């Protein structure tokens, strides 16, 4: 993992929100992010993460900017550190179809917060306002600006990828191991050929249209 001075400085620049909030007497800051709002299949997953003060985590960045190998390394470093607190929320395809993806995403985030081992004083949420008893601050593109949100984005992404690999073993014909449920040409062609599986989001327009054709 890159532990160069520039990488450490980059991480330190990403804890500005957290340091500002601590100076305002919000002692415990949790970053919240999700993975899987856009795919045509699989659950939506959220993570809440509280990073320990004064500790540097090289590699923590927006999960979309990291390679799979880098993400896995950072995920392992976060999960193996006893001072890092995190929670995971998973909302099923059935629930997504029932309430819509935005509401399902919020439910996943609330689940993740509830599963934290300690209660935060304030929530930093990537791109969404989350109704909660705990004060909430929405940060646009927060996974690129806040270390806590970036850590949450990595934990959520890695957890969801693991779930999609499990689904791949059940439905190998769709290639979930390659695209994780996103609407690639390979995935769309597989749906056309085999029809939607139980883990496809029937409320999403492309799936809905293909169901109508079938």
From Swiss-Prot:
<feature type="domain" description="RNase H type-2">
    <location>
        <begin position="27"/>
        <end position="214"/>
    </location>
</feature>
<dbReference type="GO" id="GO:0006298">
    <property type="term" value="P:mismatch repair"/>
</dbReference>
<feature type="binding site">
    <location>
        <position position="34"/>
    </location>
    <ligand>
        <name>a divalent metal cation</name>
    </ligand>
</feature>
<dbReference type="InterPro" id="IPR012337">
    <property type="entry name" value="RNaseH-like_sf"/>
</dbReference>
<keyword id="KW-0464">Manganese</keyword>
<keyword id="KW-0963">Cytoplasm</keyword>
<comment type="function">
    <text>Endonuclease that specifically degrades the RNA of RNA-DNA hybrids.</text>
</comment>
<dbReference type="GO" id="GO:0032299">
    <property type="term" value="C:ribonuclease H2 complex"/>
</dbReference>
<keyword id="KW-0255">Endonuclease</keyword>
<dbReference type="InterPro" id="IPR022898">
    <property type="entry name" value="RNase_HII"/>
</dbReference>
<dbReference type="GO" id="GO:0043137">
    <property type="term" value="P:DNA replication, removal of RNA primer"/>
</dbReference>
<dbReference type="InterPro" id="IPR036397">
    <property type="entry name" value="RNaseH_sf"/>
</dbReference>
<keyword id="KW-0378">Hydrolase</keyword>
<feature type="binding site">
    <location>
        <position position="126"/>
    </location>
    <ligand>
        <name>a divalent metal cation</name>
    </ligand>
</feature>
<dbReference type="InterPro" id="IPR024567">
    <property type="entry name" value="RNase_HII/HIII_dom"/>
</dbReference>
<dbReference type="GO" id="GO:0005737">
    <property type="term" value="C:cytoplasm"/>
</dbReference>
<dbReference type="GO" id="GO:0030145">
    <property type="term" value="F:manganese ion binding"/>
</dbReference>
<dbReference type="Pfam" id="PF01351">
    <property type="entry name" value="RNase_HII"/>
</dbReference>
<keyword id="KW-0540">Nuclease</keyword>
<comment type="similarity">
    <text>Belongs to the RNase HII family.</text>
</comment>
<dbReference type="GO" id="GO:0004523">
    <property type="term" value="F:RNA-DNA hybrid ribonuclease activity"/>
</dbReference>
<dbReference type="GO" id="GO:0003723">
    <property type="term" value="F:RNA binding"/>
</dbReference>
<protein>
    <recommendedName>
        <fullName>Ribonuclease HII</fullName>
        <ecNumber>3.1.26.4</ecNumber>
    </recommendedName>
</protein>
<dbReference type="InterPro" id="IPR001352">
    <property type="entry name" value="RNase_HII/HIII"/>
</dbReference>
<feature type="binding site">
    <location>
        <position position="33"/>
    </location>
    <ligand>
        <name>a divalent metal cation</name>
    </ligand>
</feature>
<keyword id="KW-0479">Metal-binding</keyword>
